[in-house]
Amino acid sequence: MENLVITLYDLHNLRLAYNSERSYHAGMGYLLLEGGAEFGGRMRDPDLKAIELAGGFNAPIRIIPTAAAPDNNHQRAGNNGIHWFQSLGAKDVISVSLLSKIRADDKNIAQSLRNAKLIYLLGGFTHYLGQTLKDSLAWEAAVDAYRNGAVIAGSSAGAMVMCEFYFDPSAGRVHEGLNLIPHTLVLPHHNTFGKGWAPKLIKKIPDVTLLGIDEQTGMIDDGEDNMWNVYGAGEVTLYQNGDVTVYQPGNEFSI
């Protein structure tokens, strides 16, 4: 890309069935960043963990398909998300019709997100997603849900806008994100094209931690003292203070 201007599954089911009868995590919630190629294959582990942290299979899951709206792919992408989470056992999954800045200020959509326990931002057009959600009632509601224990998750563009900064490859520019994770920028699809962004971004924003996340891989801040854990098929690569560190599934780290 040139534009730089008892199985583990059974154990999860047992834990989720138990957690569905309990209240969700009190206080600040959890964040899940995924590197792309969501809704299939080896993404089962991070997504099941997110459902567990959200309170179990009965937890309300709300999918935000905004990033797929510019090329009219939002309905297909949203339906893929619904089918995926239902295949994992989730009972209450809806793709919200948040496709524009006007819809981002719709009070009914905002209330649906405020009541959610897992909010999932799909991939697609990064800058469109960031600009649509920025300073909106919908995003304010999502943050309220997070402060009350919900999980906010994002894949590819969805993960990118969750950080303080994101890179828009179509314009070759760095923009301010939604800042759930300060001093960071996600490099999605790191094992395919995302790693190619790293050299110039390190020069452009040297004080920002770059989070290179492979496809079919997620990182969740579910460890003690908000430590991050790696789930899924690939690796997470941290570019921080001039160092490059690679973490495997099962590894724990801080940012």
PLM region spans:
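C-terminal and late-domain segments of enzyme folds
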Residues: Y18-F57, A67-N79, H83-S87, D168, ...
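Short hydrophobic targeting helices and cationic amphipathic motifs
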Residues: L4, L11-L14
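Class I SAM-dependent methyltransferase SAM-binding "motif I" and its flanking Rossmann-like core
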Residues: L122, Y128-K195
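Portal/gating segments that form or line small-molecule/metal binding sites
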Residues: A68-G123, Y128
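General beta-strand structural signal in soluble alpha/beta enzymes
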Residues: L33, I94-S95, Y120-L121, I152-S155, ...
